[in-house]
Amino acid sequence: MVVEVEGFYGVYLLFCTNPKYKGRIYIGFTVNPERRIQQHNGGKHKGGAWKTSGRGPWDMVLIVHGFPNDIAALRFEWAWQHPHVSRRLTHVPRKTKKQSSFDFHLLVLCHMLRVAPWNRLPLTLRWLRQEYRRELPLLLQPPLHMPLAFGQVRARPIPKGEKEKGRLGENRAEETEQEVILLGDAVVQRCRVCYERVQDKDDSLHCFHPGCTLTAHIMCLAKLFLLNEPQNLIPVEGLCPSCGHSLLWGDLIRHRNGCYGDLEEISSSQAHWGDELHRCSD
């Protein structure tokens, strides 16, 4: 089964199966995994990287996805490629002679998912090829909010008009249309947390549970979710101040950005995340 994800940003690991170069790995960033592996195996003239050109075939073994934007994903890619240069990973031991490049970079990945800023992001670690799967060290398991997934993933573009719809809030859309009819241009939305007027729709979040009309400033809702952990900048989850349902921060951001394809599945199983608010630092 292929899982489709809207607003896709991922960082992947390739494994070389060419007998001449077998065991070599490559780490890269993509917004379209299916297209990217074809480019790598097609060579430079097909858009592949020069480091992988002429050394295929390559298998795309695993991918980390759920980044809020390309900048966050690219910074993650760089740190994974250069663990001993990144100030976030100075504690990671260097590769031993007995370690394969694949096992070493998997170990680096385990460390990365447990340190700031990445340990607060709503990431998914997905094994794309079952035959390469490794058991992660017991003491280096990802945070509980980061699921381990299996199987292929496909990037799906956000449909036109859905992004605007998401920022307004699906439940608020019909209500606001009625307000426009009744009040003309005098449509006023107030934050459910601070009760101040919401001036900019780009600065607001909306609950996606049916019947809930929550509107709140991003910062107000973030601070509410972080009341018990003020040392952090990025919330993981919290209770909707309007309907009382548990909300994953990443789901709220994906909903705001117009991603609806996997929200129904997420809200019921809590198996996938999406996040924003704070741009990752390297």
Swiss-Prot record:
UniProt xrefs under Pfam families:
GIY-YIG, SLX1_C
Q: Which SUPFAM superfamilies match?
A: GIY-YIG endonuclease
Domain GIY-YIG stretches: 7-97
From the Swiss-Prot or TrEMBL record, what is one GO molecular function term?
zinc ion binding
A GO CC term? Slx1-Slx4 complex
Q: Which domain of life is it from?
A: Eukaryota
Q: Which cofactor does it need?
A: a divalent metal cation
Q: What is its EC number?
A: 3.1.-.-
Q: Where are the zinc fingers (SLX1-type)?
A: 191-243
Q: Which InterPro entries match?
A: GIY-YIG_endonuc, GIY-YIG_endonuc_sf, Slx1, SLX1_C, SLX1_endonuclease, Znf_RING/FYVE/PHD
Q: Where in the cell is it found?
A: Nucleus
Instruction: Please name the Gene3D superfamilies in this protein's record.
Output: GIY-YIG endonuclease, Zinc/RING finger domain, C3HC4 (zinc finger)
Q: What is its main location?
A: nucleus
Q: Which GO terms describe its biological process?
A: double-strand break repair via homologous recombination
Enzymatic class: hydrolase
* Keyword terms of this UniProt record: DNA damage, DNA recombination, DNA repair, Endonuclease, Hydrolase, Metal-binding, Nuclease, Nucleus, Zinc, Zinc-finger
Q: Matching PANTHER family, A to Z? A: STRUCTURE-SPECIFIC ENDONUCLEASE SUBUNIT SLX1
What this protein is reported to do is described as: Catalytic subunit of the slx1-slx4 structure-specific endonuclease that resolves DNA secondary structures generated during DNA repair and recombination. Has endonuclease activity towards branched DNA substrates, introducing single-strand cuts in duplex DNA close to junctions with ss-DNA.
Q: Which family does it belong to?
A: Belongs to the SLX1 family.
**Complex and partners:** Forms a heterodimer with slx4.
What is the official name of this protein in its record? Answer: Structure-specific endonuclease subunit slx1
Biological source species:
Xenopus laevis
User: What would be the name of the gene that encodes this protein?
Assistant: slx1a
